């Protein structure tokens, strides 16, 4: 991959291990982004790797004020809402959901073995009450490129001359890289954007600088300022797979409470009231 010689490399400023935790009955999660990192990682609100048994899942629940990206790594989940939208997200598929002013949906596993990731992306105040919508991409529809031992799936943004067709209300890059043993990649990222990586597989990934220590799976790696993210796979036997995620900061107050992401506590209170009274985007809560 080519890049400008005057590029400014982004170095690692923080790394966090997403520890395995139980959540409810039959679900296990790894929380990669929590409230403590929301200011540092603006516009990103939450990142969770999840797996749940056939007896588990998430019955009808509301959302408002953000977009969610669900990316299945293994198995599948069945998604539906009271308006009749229903679909199954299989391994390699993506659902990009704009909750906007209000959406109610459920998510249940299709198979006993399933594993996926969900990212929440904040919306600016001017977009928080937009109409909800879904964009679903099958694995076959996601553009990809391969070069010098590096494969990338371009879910949002662009890489290796390939551009995703997905429109994101908050400008976002979402790339799934797999580096064969001994390979490296250098990805340009807009200088003003926030950028981080989440390692899915591998134990000898070097991020930001060749002088950095190797980082293993299930870590979130946060990058500092610059316009170039460099990654090396130092393993001689194992591939390195990671998500590179970047986005334009919004720079507004963030108040998250449960399924709602707004700008103030008053707006959070209003969201709960609207849901409980089935109004202002949550009319289907009556069903």
From Swiss-Prot:
Annotated Gene Ontology cellular component terms: nucleus
One Pfam family named in its UniProt record: Pirin
Location relative to the cell: Nucleus
Positions carrying N-acetylthreonine: 2
Induction text: Up-regulated by abscisic acid (ABA) and low-fluence red light, but not by low-fluence blue light.
Chief site of localization: nucleus
Consequence of gene disruption: Altered response to blue light (BL) and abscisic acid (ABA).
Annotated GO biological process: abscisic acid-activated signaling pathway; blue light signaling pathway; response to abscisic acid
Alphabetical UniProt keywords: Abscisic acid signaling pathway, Acetylation, Nucleus
InterPro entries from the UniProt entry: Pirin, Pirin_C_dom, Pirin_N_dom, RmlC-like_jellyroll, RmlC_Cupin_sf
Assembly and binders: Interacts with the G protein alpha-1 subunit GPA1. Interacts with NFYB6 and NFYB9.
Domain text: Contains one cupin domain that is not required for interaction with the G protein alpha subunit.
Function: Involved in abscisic acid signal transduction. Plays a role in seed germination and early seedling development. Involved in the blue light (BL) signaling.
Family to which this protein belongs: Belongs to the pirin family.
Identification of the protein by name: Pirin-1
Organism: Arabidopsis thaliana (Mouse-ear cress)
